[in-house]
């Protein structure tokens, strides 16, 4: 009996090894993938970023140096949940993509360059870099070298905070690079539970896109999930560092899957959570993680050999705060506060396609309608498409021409004007089109601003 069991075990083991070997042969030219997840430790007392109101601000700026890392805003008082940096490295032939997600309200180009420079110094092979912020409003501040953003919502720049975040990003990429191996991939979409509401009273995008990556043998390597939601379930009164609902949901998924889970926000400009508070946050995180887990189970990974990247540089109008869009039509339209001294006049969009799954970065908070327009135009070329919002830069809000006219917070924060949202949406569509050329859509409006493209 024992002999039969041994023989059966050897046969089953041999069959398993043969199956893995066969899969490995099928994956001889597969995309390789590596992922990592690491806890971030910022200096104690670092301020929080996201809310600009008085509940987060010091009564007086810290001109006397009472706080080591805070100036305009109150210091944090510890962590509610661990801050996490996650990384995914993809490679196919000479094409490489390094993707970093952080529990931050946003990232600016200076921060991204700091990560790029440190990656180069550390000897990590050169890759197209995407740095995505989750948009939590309870993440650390003081990491942007911008006087304007510091005053408004992030606090004065502190190199110690920025360096800690950059170091975590580089360490995560290095670890992901070390674990890189042939991978199977698949993407799917699931409907989100009713956990968001529109700031503009309009239809929202209920889609959660789930990108599943496994080893050749089926072991989970990484999960990327894309959904639009503001990280404002914790209020401005909260002074504990937190990844908010998206961070909690991702942590739950990591515990179940045993692999890094990267959250990437979507077209979030007009999207708020339906409920607020710590208990509601935990309930919403559970609902979202359950939906994403269903997407993971639904996706059927297969060998994938193509990774394409397209980059598109877009010039922008002069940025300014329009007092008419902030306070109403009674204010003459020519009254505006110019911001050209503090905000860029150009931006770069990165589009990538892993087989029939494509995404494009967006440097801020895009309105749902424009995000859905991007998806609609690209769905003829790709099975799954998503917008990676709050990635590689932060330039405020981008809305439709119609919704820029009303005096709302969203319109007030649309500092590049009523045409910039459509302009960047068109540029994003063009970047996706370059990944898989096809017939030009007859319904797509032409770009409203000059742009240049470089593709490979």
Spell out what each predicted region is.
Residues 1-2:
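N-terminal secretory signal peptides that target proteins for export/translocation
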Residues 5-16:
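Bacterial N-terminal signal peptides
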Residues 17-24:
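Sec/Tat signal peptide C-region and signal peptidase I cleavage site
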Residues 24-132, 136-268, 273-283, 296, ...:
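Conserved beta-alpha junction segments in alpha/beta enzyme cores
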Residues 288:
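Anionic-ligand-binding alpha/beta catalytic cores of soluble enzymes and soluble regulatory domains
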């Amino acid at each position: 009996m024992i002999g039969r069991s041994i023989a059966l075990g050897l046969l089953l083991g041999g069959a398993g090894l043969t199956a893995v070997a066969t899969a490995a042969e099928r994956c001889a030219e597969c995309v390789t993938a590596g992922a990592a997840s690491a806890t971030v430790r910022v200096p104690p007392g670092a301020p929080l970023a996201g809310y600009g109101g008085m509940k987060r601000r010091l009564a007086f700026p810290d001109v006397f140096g009472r706080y080591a890392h805070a100036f305009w805003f109150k210091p944090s008082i510890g962590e509610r949940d661990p801050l996490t940096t996650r990384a995914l490295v993809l490679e196919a032939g000479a094409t490489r993509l390094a993707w970093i997600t952080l529990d931050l309200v946003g990232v600016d180009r200076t921060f991204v360059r700091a990560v790029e420079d440190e990656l180069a110094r550390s000897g990590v092979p050169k890759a197209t870099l995407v740095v995505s912020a989750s948009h939590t409003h309870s993440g650390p501040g003081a990491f942007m070298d911008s006087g304007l953003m510091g005053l408004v919502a992030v606090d004065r720049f502190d190199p110690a905070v920025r360096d800690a975040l950059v170091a975590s990003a580089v360490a995560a990429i290095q670890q992901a690079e070390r674990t890189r191996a042939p991978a199977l991939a698949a993407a799917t979409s699931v409907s989100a539970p009713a956990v968001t509401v529109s700031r503009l009273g309009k239809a929202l995008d209920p889609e959660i896109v789930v990108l599943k990556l496994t080893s050749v043998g089926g072991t989970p390597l990484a999960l990327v999930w894309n959904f639009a939601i503001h990280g404002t379930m914790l209020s401005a009164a909260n002074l504990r560092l937190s990844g908010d609902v998206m961070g909690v949901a991702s942590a739950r998924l990591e515990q179940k899957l045993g692999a890094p889970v990267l959250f990437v926000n979507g077209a979030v400009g007009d999207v708020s959570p339906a409920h607020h508070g710590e208990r509601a946050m935990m309930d919403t995180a559970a609902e979202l993680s359950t939906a994403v887990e269903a997407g993971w189970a639904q996706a059927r990974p297969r060998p994938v050999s193509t990774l394409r990247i397209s980059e598109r540089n877009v010039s922008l109008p002069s940025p300014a705060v329009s007092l008419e869009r902030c306070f109403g039509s009674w204010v003459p339209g020519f009254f505006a506060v110019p911001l050209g001294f503090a905000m860029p006049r150009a931006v770069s969009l990165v589009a990538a396609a892993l087989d029939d799954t494509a995404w494009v970065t967006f440097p801020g908070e895009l309105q749902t309608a424009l995000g859905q327009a991007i998806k609609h135009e690209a769905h003829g070329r790709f099975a799954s498409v998503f917008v990676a919002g709050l990635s590689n830069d932060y330039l405020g809000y981008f809305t439709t021409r119609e919704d820029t006219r009303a005096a709302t917070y969203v319109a007030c924060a649309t500092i590049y004007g009523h045409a910039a949202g459509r302009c960047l949406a068109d540029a994003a569509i063009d970047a996706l089109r370059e990944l898989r050329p096809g017939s030009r859509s007859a319904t797509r409006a032409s770009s409203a601003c000059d742009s240049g493209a470089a593709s490979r």
